Structure formats: structure tokens, C-alpha cells
């Protein structure tokens, strides 16, 4: 057996492991502090987790993908738009790195934004689904936050435009 064949088998096992163990939104045992007010989203990038503070002692935790090295960011913002079945116009930086990308990716199974996007602030970043679920739990994006499609739909139903989002290391 060649080393390339063995590498392909290992990659297949890793990919299947990610598919076989999808994220489950689950209540967290931790209690929110005053910083984590009800209705707020907290993103913990090093842990690759998004927390939605549902109630005083009720936090829903989602597994996410975050910005790769050099693309991470921290700070506070809010949800400025909510879009189901979004089209995506790749920004110039992403098109430069991926010249095969079209100027516009229509909604559907090939769209990197998945089934929904929560646009943050001025629109540079968002919390969105994905067409690459195997990347959830990794440092993979250009700064956006990827979720399993079922998880973004769950979060989408819980938040409104204006919801506060805090991104911490």
C-alpha cells in the first residue's frame, strides 16, 4: 500500500467522523454573568463555540468553525440582517485566493453560506451555515463563523436584528 493511499484512507476516516458526530445544541451547565445578558450571543474562538444566552441559567452551546490564523478577530457587534437561503458574492480577497470562484454563488447546496446567514455589523462578517460541515470545530474561515445548517436554523429562529454579539479569544 502506498503512502498516498493510506493518507486518503485517513482523511476519509476523519471526514466520516465529523459527519457521524454532528453538533447538538445543548444547554450549558454554566451560569451567565452580567456580561452574558439574556438574548446575547458569545463566541469563544479558541474553544470554537458559540453560546446563546437563552435565560438566566440557560445557555445553548453550538460547535462552530472560526477564522483561521491571521483571520481571527474579537470585539462587540450586533446582527444587522437575517437572510434565509442567501446568495454569496465572494469578497475580492477570497476571490484572489480562489480565482475559480464565480462572482456570485446562488443559494443552494454549493453555497458556502449554507441555508442561512446572520449578518454582523457592516456586513464584513457573519454567522452562517456551511456546505462543508467537516470544517465545524476547526479554524477554517476568513473571519466568519460557520455552523452546521441545522444549528444556524435553530439560532436564526431565536435571535432578532439588533441582537448583541461578543467575540472573545
Predicted feature residues:
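Exported/periplasmic cell-wall-interacting domains
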Residues: 27-28, 36, 56, 70-71, ...
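Sec/Tat signal peptide C-region and signal peptidase I cleavage site
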Residues: 21-25
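N-terminal secretory signal peptides
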Residues: 27-71
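Bacterial N-terminal signal peptides
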Residues: 8-18
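N-terminal secretory signal peptides that target proteins for export/translocation
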Residues: 1-4
Amino acid at each position: 500500500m502506498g503512502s498516498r493511499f493510506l493518507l486518503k484512507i485517513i482523511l476519509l476516516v476523519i471526514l466520516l467522523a465529523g459527519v457521524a458526530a454532528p453538533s447538538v445544541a445543548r444547554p450549558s451547565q454554566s451560569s451567565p454573568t452580567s456580561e452574558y445578558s439574556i438574548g446575547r450571543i458569545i463566541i469563544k474562538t479558541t474553544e470554537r463555540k458559540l453560546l446563546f444566552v437563552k435565560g438566566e441559567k440557560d445557555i445553548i452551546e453550538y460547535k462552530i468553525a472560526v477564522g483561521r490564523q491571521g483571520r481571527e478577530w474579537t470585539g462587540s457587534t450586533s446582527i444587522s440582517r437575517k437572510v434565509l437561503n442567501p446568495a454569496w458574492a465572494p469578497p475580492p480577497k477570497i476571490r484572489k485566493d480562489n480565482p475559480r470562484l464565480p462572482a456570485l454563488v446562488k443559494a443552494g447546496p454549493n453555497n458556502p453560506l449554507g441555508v442561512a446567514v446572520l449578518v454582523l455589523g457592516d456586513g464584513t462578517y457573519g454567522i452562517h451555515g456551511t456546505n462543508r460541515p467537516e470544517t465545524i470545530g476547526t479554524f477554517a474561515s476568513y473571519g466568519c463563523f460557520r455552523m452546521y445548517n441545522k444549528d444556524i436554523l435553530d439560532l436564526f429562529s431565536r435571535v432578532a436584528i439588533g441582537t448583541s454579539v461578543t467575540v472573545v479569544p
